[in-house]
Swiss-Prot record:
This is Endocuticle structural glycoprotein SgAbd-8. Glycans are attached at residues 14-15, 97. Residues 111-139 are annotated as: Disordered. It comes from Schistocerca gregaria. Residues 29-99 form the Chitin-binding type R&R domain. Keywords: Cuticle, Glycoprotein, Pyrrolidone carboxylic acid. One of its GO terms (molecular function) is structural constituent of chitin-based larval cuticle.
């Protein structure tokens, strides 16, 4: 049976938010820079350019920028980032970080890293060649 769903209601300021500052520049070489700031405290900027132009397999766009705003709970949010051939790399005080490595594990990792490479233990393919399966009844 069909029942109309309640429509969400939005409260708050419905008046337009002014753009205080806006810039957008594109260069003939493909590099760019843009930025803006709004009347309610949102700000963002980014610049980018082609890295290693003309070098096959190394050519990639690289962008760096930031954005900031105030979260609904009133806390300031600010993110700086780089986006390149290795992915998106954000930094911000509010972003989660991995827990520290426990000292015992760190000592073990340091010990392993300090050991010389052992012959045949470097991933160089020192494995026995696979053998064919015997035919059924040929035992």
């Amino acid at each position: 049976q069909f029942r109309p769903q309640p429509q969400p209601s939005y409260s708050g300021n419905t008046s337009p938010i002014p753009i205080i500052r806006y810039s957008n520049e594109i260069s003939p070489d493909g590099s760019y820079a843009w930025s803006y700031e709004t009347g309610n405290g949102i700000a963002a900027d980014e610049s980018g350019a082609l890295e290693n132009p003309g070098q096959k397999d190394l050519e990639a766009m690289r962008a760096q920028g930031s954005f900031s705003y105030t979260a609904p709970d009133g806390s300031p949010i600010s993110v700086r980032y780089v986006a390149d051939r290795d992915g998106f790399h954000p930094e911000g005080a509010h972003l989660p970080t991995p827990p520290p490595i426990p000292p015992a594990i760190q000592r073990a990792l340091d010990f392993i890293a300090s050991q010389p490479q052992q012959p045949g233990n470097n991933g160089g393919g020192q494995f026995p060649r696979p053998q064919p399966f015997p035919r059924p009844g040929a035992f």
